[in-house]
Design a protein with these regions (language model features):
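Alpha-helical transmembrane segments of multi-pass membrane proteins predominantly involved
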Residues: 1-496
Length: 496
């Protein structure tokens, strides 16, 4: 006879679902508005999306730390709240980039903004749960929306990028599902805290380490795809090149924040259980990723592809902090992305401004270095701002990313990994070359003759976004200490 199911309203705790429900409801409202009136201007959808995200931000900020909800499937801890806030802030920065001075195909569709909000909800589900099934649901919700957003750019290479991303995403999802299945077979649970408890009691069993090895390898491969770690990074440059510049910048930050949070929960569990080879594997992947991506970035002819390889290198840099498995190391991950987010989105936004009606310099690339030759004479303020972003990405003090790099290196040294800090320093020196290369083109070279250079995509919303990104990049020295204190408090309160 089946046992009766008792549903406790206390265990529901639906307030933990509020941020995701706000994003989903917002997307549905936009679709309904389009059904009622198909002629509404895109600026209305932009403003409505920003309003929904602001409400979402407030709902997330109002959550209590270390709370469970929805039958204990939702986990609201410090890491969950921080990552949701960062995801929303990154999204608020991205959305105004739709209000360009020219009409672009994807932004004329209300579905673009609805899909964008559904994607945000997917990312929020990923970071606000330690249940492997809900993480998978969030991952696929966000991924399917993102594939469509890339394709909506409506160019041949955008379709190619969407198909490549879809193929790699499907492969990553398969590895994640298989890894989760092995974990469930081992422990009889898909909730990470229960998985850790069961594994801890069975570590000495014969043959168990082989099964743990299988699950960890499958999950590592899945998140290596999502974080574009070597050797699973090959899709990223082509996808970034095919996507619109703002969306490429967004993809280099927000999806990776969500993937890093899940990686912290899963691989931190393995390291805490004493599975030391997981730490070693992560360190090897991190070093190979940051080094090889930097070497590839050195030989790129296109600024957008250079920034794509740069983003891969930064992901490797941060992955090394994950292997430390300390509160300081985990804090450095969130600090780095909080600072990197403004700088990298700002850099990609500058590419969005410097558009041409036709490819004037190269048959393949949209943003070859030659395009930026003499940029200081064509658009002086833009050249200075782009130069600041490049100096920040290179880790030059006192700009924002410098503080992130220093904190990650400090965490490595304090954990006894002096060699890792040295590798990070050497990679930062290599990266400085290709960032300074663009600065040399902009400030020390003459504009290409006999070419009518047009930078025509600037609008006031874009100016506001770039101004905000510039202030965050230049003024980091004034807010870095309070930011570190807040992040450290929230992460230590979560037990990481």
């Amino acid at each position: 006879m089946l046992q009766p199911i008792n549903v406790s309203l206390e265990s529901l705790n639906l307030i933990t679902l509020a941020p995701m429900l706000i994003a989903i409801a917002g997307g549905l409202v936009i679709l309904v508005l389009d059904l009622i009136n198909e002629k509404l201007h895109k600026s209305l959808y932009v403003m409505l999306t920003i309003l929904i995200l602001v409400v979402d931000f407030g709902a997330t900020l109002g959550l209590n730390v270390n709370e469970r909800g929805f039958f204990d499937v939702m986990l609201i801890d410090g890491i969950s709240i921080i990552s949701q806030l960062m995801i929303i802030v990154g999204s608020i920065i991205f959305i105004p980039l739709a209000l360009t001075s020219k009409r672009f195909h994807e932004y004329s569709y209300p579905e673009f903004f609805a899909l964008f909000l559904f994607m945000i909800a997917g990312f929020q589900f990923m970071v606000a749960s330690d249940n492997l099934i809900l993480i998978f649901v969030g991952l696929e919700t966000a991924s399917l929306s993102l594939y469509t957003l890339i394709a909506l750019h409506n160019r041949a290479n955008s379709y190619e990028a969407a198909v490549k991303y879809f193929t790699m995403g499907a492969l990553a999802a398969a590895f994640f599902a298989m890894g989760s299945a092995v974990v469930y077979a081992l422990t009889g649970s898909v909730e990470l805290y229960k998985v850790a408890e069961v594994m801890a009691t069975r570590l000495n069993e014969t043959g168990l380490m082989i099964a743990i090895f299988g699950s960890a390898v499958l999950l590592l491969v899945a998140f290596s795809f999502k974080l574009s770690l070597f050797p699973f990074h090959t899709w990223a440059p082509d996808v970034y090149e095919g996507a619109s510049a703002p969306l490429a910048g967004y993809m280099s930050v927000v999806p990776k924040i969500a993937a890093f949070v899940v990686s912290i929960r899963i691989f931190g569990m393995y390291i805490d259980l004493g599975v030391e080879w997981v730490r070693v594997t992560i360190l090897v992947l991190a070093v190979l990723t940051m080094t090889l991506a930097n070497i590839m970035a050195l030989v790129q002819e296109d600024v957008k592809r250079m920034l794509a390889y740069s983003s891969i290198s930064h992901a490797g840099f941060i992955m090394a902090a994950l292997a430390l498995d300390t509160t300081e190391g985990t804090t450095s991950i969130f600090l780095y992305y909080a600072l990197f987010m403004f700088t990298n989105l700002g850099a990609f936004a500058m590419l969005w401004i410097s558009r041409h009606k036709n490819r004037r310099f190269d048959k393949r690339y949209d943003h070859p270095y030659e395009k930026f030759a003499g940029f200081i004479h064509i658009m002086p303020v833009g050249a200075v701002i782009m130069g600041l972003f490049m100096l920040s990405l290179a880790g030059v003090p006192p700009f924002s990313v410098f503080w992130g790099k220093i904190y990650v290196m400090q965490a490595a040294v304090n954990s006894g990994y002096i060699w890792l800090a040295i590798v990070m320093g050497l990679n930062s020196a290599i990266a400085a070359y290709y960032y300074l290369k663009l600065i040399v083109y902009m400030f020390l070279m003459d504009p290409v003759k006999d070419v009518d250079t047009i930078y025509y995509n600037l609008s006031k919303p874009l100016m506001a976004v770039i101004g905000m990104a510039t202030l965050a990049t230049v003024g980091a020295i004034f807010y870095i200490q309070p930011l570190i204190s807040y992040l450290y408090y929230m992460i230590s309160a979560s037990g990481y």
